[in-house]
Amino acid sequence: MDTEQGLKNHTAKTSPHDETAMASLTTIPTSVTLSAEQFEKLYLSPLTQRQGMLSKQMGNPTPLALGGFVITTTPLSCCLMGWRGATGSGIAFTGPIIFLGGGLLVLTSILEFILGNTFPCVVFGTIGAFWFAFGCTMTPAFNAAAPFSTSATDTVAGLSSPDFLNTYAFLFIWMGVLMLIFLACATRTNAVYVAIFTTLTLVFGFLSGAYWRLAVADALVGNRLVVAAGACLFVASMLGFYLLVAQLFDSVGLPVRLPVGDLSRFWDRRAR
């Protein structure tokens, strides 16, 4: 009994060292609550009630897609505008188009799907798949354009043949329609995203017109439309860089907050 009572007295007593140690303990937050505006800025998707716990446990994959997008579209836009004598409609960038444009965007699309972000999943997945298709079309191993050449084996000649140009222009037409749909959905997020899809819609419209004019040997108008497409793509690239910088600044906690023109408030007011 004496031993048991001694143990109770010993455990009931707290040494000054223990009190000092307990007093020095502080609570460290392990999670951060994002507002609807912050969520839409980081994930480029409206905040819904169906957001799962994974979005709190995993990193934000959206900047990865933006990085792949801008590093692909920026040099391609310079090529389309013919800067420093660049030619070839992007054939020189086949590798970056497939691995940076296609690979990173499709990878991000899968990650957005896991997080439950439907809109960016669809956007990055379809644009990434387009880059895969565009790059593969220019790759001789896929033999997509060679049958349109006179020798049926020359990919470069096939890419500039009237039959190929008339046919491939339809892909640009419907990509433009898809960008228009994305534009309507982006009005729920922010103004920068809306501007990106606006310029991308123009890019595909100009490219389809350019291909059809070049198919009838109207090089003057066709080349001007290609330059116009390159200019619009360059604007989209700069907007993409801006959005990427804004997201990366927020991700590392820099005090500089770049405005992106939140549009969710407009829709919230309309809902009321």
UniProtKB/Swiss-Prot annotation:
GO molecular function: acetate transmembrane transporter activity
Biased composition (Polar residues): 1-14
InterPro entries according to UniProt: AceTr, Gpr1/Fun34/SatP-like
Domain of life: Eukaryota
Main location group: membrane
Subcellular location as annotated: Cell membrane; Cell septum
Keyword Transferase: no
Annotated GO CC locations: cell septum; plasma membrane
Transmembrane residue ranges: 63-83, 91-111, 122-144, 164-184, 192-212, 225-245
A Pfam family annotated for this UniProt entry: Gpr1_Fun34_YaaH
PANTHER family, per database record: ACCUMULATION OF DYADS PROTEIN 2-RELATED (PTHR31123), PROTEIN ALCS (PTHR31123:SF4)
Designated name of the protein: Protein alcS
Native source organism of the sequence: Aspergillus fumigatus (strain ATCC MYA-4609 / CBS 101355 / FGSC A1100 / Af293)
Lineage of the organism: Eukaryota, Fungi, Dikarya, Ascomycota, Pezizomycotina
Gene transcribed to yield this protein: alcS
